[in-house]
Amino acid sequence: MRSNVIIAAAGLALLVGLGLGRAAAGQQSADADDPVRTLVSRLQLEQYKATLKGLTRFGDRRQGTTRNRDAVDWIEAQLQAVGCTSTERITYNYDPQPRTGGGGRRGRGTGPPLNPTEPTPTGGRIGRNGNGPGGSSIFGYRRRTGVVRDPMAQLDEALRALNSEEPTNGERTEVFCTKVGTTNPDEMYIIGAHMDGHGFGEAANDDGSGTALVMELARIFNAPDVQTARSIRFALWNNEETGLNGSSAYVEQRRERQGLESPPGSGRYPEPRWLGMIQHDMMLFDHGAPGPDGVVSRDQRREADVNIEFQSSSDLADESRDLAFVFKAASDAYATDYPAMVGPHMTNTDSTPFMNIVPSISLRENERGMHVGAGWDPHWHQPTDLYSTFTDDDFRLGLNAAQTTLAAIAQLVEATIVGR
């Protein structure tokens, strides 16, 4: 397995040396023949929004329900329609113990005060305010977070009815498709997002925004005139909200099959060697920290950015950090509206099961531990996570994350446009 890491690290070093290092210095290429710029230009805001809107017809897509299964079927059909016809499914069982206690708004309005009443040692009103997951530290005001479990919190009767079915234990599936490389089909980057949600809304941001992003990248990379030297897998995980069960099932079932040619001599690799895993989870909402009253701004903040995270405590922290900065350089060169920043506290997302096996990063709207964990997104797991909640400024942040991933992956897999 270590050979995979050596291959990936060598590829990242070569890429930085050949081009992304220059982009990181801010020297953007205006070359009209640049295939990466052409591919990035094929990402359109209205198309991204339409794909996301399509997902919301299935409500919150809560795992173990008909609406979730219907959404998996719809995603597979959409992938096939855009040319990613090699769809497959991972099947696994999810049989949790029954929940104890009542429903309602878990974590909201209960517990000790979140914010200190005393000034900081230097006399400031608010400063360090505890720790978050993934090794993060929280600063500034916090607001309570939690999962809404009361269907009556959803005021839209039609949506409430759509989301009324409760999960049942049993078999689960998730779908992926693969763009096969022309010269190195046995090497692969995995691009993922989770398609399930909860909270009795539409799971538009968490994680319809990431799912739509991955589907849009599948559309562009599988266009008839696009070739890649290496393979790309587009994976839409299930059961993220219950503990990363879908991505964990993928790792458990597929990691030992990496690089095996089947049948021998066929040139076919059902599970190419993993070179990197890139997750996308909550892409739209960077409105800043809550104020003393717990209120978050209605508007995207001027300093909004895409957060690229790796986990500094993982076995492959150095390689994952290098991958993160490849994506940062791609953003510097090709993103149109918002910058990107790199942080070391990736956590609580579907790249976690991969992070000790292959270089792994996560792209998102905020830092997961320091920001999301402190309540920066008031719609997280809430009935207000609706398509209509977000504006074009929000959708553009998601599109900029798509531009970043597309540009980085296009260079890592050596994408070309046939006929140019």
What are the functions of these language-model segments?
Residues 237-350, 356-360, 367:
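Metal-dependent peptidase/peptidase-like ectodomains
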Residues 24-72, 76-77, 82-89, 179-181, ...:
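N-terminal hydrophobic or amphipathic helices/low-complexity stretches enriched
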Residues 369-420:
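His/Asp/Glu-rich mid-to-C-terminal helical/loop segments that flank catalytic regions of hydrolases
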Residues 175-177, 191-245, 405:
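Alpha-helical metal-binding/catalytic segments enriched in His/Glu/Asp
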Residues 50, 54-178:
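A non-catalytic alpha/beta surface segment that caps or lines the substrate-entry region
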Residues 48-56, 87-89, 174-178, 188-192, ...:
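Structural recognition of the beta-strand scaffold that forms the well-ordered cores
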Residues 8-19:
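Bacterial N-terminal signal peptides
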Residues 34-42, 56-67, 160-166, 196-208, ...:
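Second-shell loop/turn segments in exported
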